[in-house]
Amino acid sequence: MLVLIAGLPGTGKSTIAMHLARRLRATVLRTDVIRKQLFPEPKYTEEEKELVYRVTFLIAEYLLRAERNVILDGTFYKRSLRERVYQLAKAMKTKLIIVECCAPEAVVKQRMEMRAKKKNIPTDADFEVYKKIRDQFEPLQRPRVIVDTSNPLEENLAEIMRYIRSRTKAARRSGRRG
């Protein structure tokens, strides 16, 4: 299974991914972490972004071939990036689950302020980055579950698991894996 967790910075994607990974026995590939491993002081150029996503997709493909569940955790704010995820799931003949994380802007701002005080956080995204990506975000159009991460974590995880079960049942009824 391939799970795409997309959304703006500060919307709780990594928290959802980490907890969901435990339930699905999945490996989480965080674009923030991969970026920091490739570029200790990233410039966020298009070339850097392309390499980060290329490496992310290569690792995901390797894990899917090994029949592992994979969670992709990143903004995936461009339709073209998400299209690559859809193509990967199709090529690997695996189920694709899409989770869109959102949160009220005031909550995001508060999270960003708290995040700025912490050490060893793999993301450099601050509220200015949030606003920039918000303005460039291309809406998701595929079937997905949308979770407001200002709601309790357990409620969101339960909603996601219900969605996964419903997509699994629908795929079985139609004779498809994904």
Predicted segment positions?
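Conserved glycine(s) of the Walker
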Residues: 12
